[in-house]
Swiss-Prot record:
Residues 1-24, 81-99, 291-345 are cytoplasmic. This is RDS/peripherin-like protein xRDS36. PROSITE patterns: RDS_ROM1. Keywords: Disulfide bond, Glycoprotein, Membrane, Transmembrane, Transmembrane helix. SUPFAM superfamilies: Tetraspanin (SSF48652). GO terms for cellular component: plasma membrane. It comes from Xenopus laevis. The lineage of its organism: Eukaryota, Metazoa, Chordata, Craniata, Vertebrata. Rod specific. Residues 44-61, 124-264 are lumenal. PANTHER family: PERIPHERIN-2, TETRASPANIN. Glycans are attached at residues 54, 229.
Amino acid sequence: MVLFKAKFSFQRRVKLAQTLWLLSWLSVLVGCLTFGMGIFLKVQLWIHNEVMDNTTAHAVPNTVITAGLVGILLGYFAGKISQASMDLTKYQRWKSFMMPFFFLAILSCIVCLAALVLSVALRGTLEESLKIGLRNAIRFYKDTDTPGRCYQKRSMDKLEMDFQCCGNNHPKDWFEVQWISNRYLDFSSKEVKDRIKSSVDGRYLMDSVPFTCCNPSSPRPCIQIEITNNSAHYSYNFQGDDVNIWVRGCREALLGYYTGIMATNGAAVTLSFLLQASVLVSLRYVQTSMDKIRDPDDVEADTEGFLLEKGVMETVNSSLEKIKDLFKSNQVETAEGGGEGAAGS
């Protein structure tokens, strides 16, 4: 049973070809936008790679970049086909490329949908990766002389300044680790000895944060040492508005930042998907309506076009059979070629 059959006069075929041409180049432009957004997200994830536990989230920009590239290529070739569809002689040159084109176009739509699903599904994975990565970055903050960890301090300092955040979940995360290297501690000092002895595992812990947690907009000089001790500072209340360090955790800040970029990527991919689907449908109508024209001198004849010649399942099964037959014929040709080569030697 033919699905979505439509009649096309010569004028309607011309308008269809013009519409296809416009949609094709819009698809190219949106593909460029999608590709650029994917590259931007990839770079941003790479910049903060040191405060992430794994690179699973990179699957999102990789898929978006792929969707953008495929969209550009398919849009370009669809535009070329639309221009050739008005000349039966030129159109015949593209006829053999139609089925591979449709296969790639459907695959491209699937990639777009996969990018959308990954943008939503990997949010939890990204949050967990940031949670573990930031926790390790804070723990290794002091290890500036240790190979593999020497850039953790710089990465964490830059992150807190750029995103106006402090710690993993909140500033108190710094209270739970020794973030000052033993290299810069005076072990002859009674205060240092007392702090180390008071810690269960012999660490130098204090209720203080790095300078990068300070809010430069505060009129008061930054209070970054003995933050929870109200009596250590004049006219100060830790529970009130006197705190002049960032109270937002870096995980929340980064997650919000990446979620915003992914939402923009999702919008670009959605638009790309809609355009590619429109190009696919339009090109299918162009193909089926042009295939009805047998005589090159009868280009202006009325024809019929359709999306599917059979039902959906029948079309899928028929396509799978054609693909299987194609692979079988290739295997036979390869085997015959190998046999001839062996006989010749």
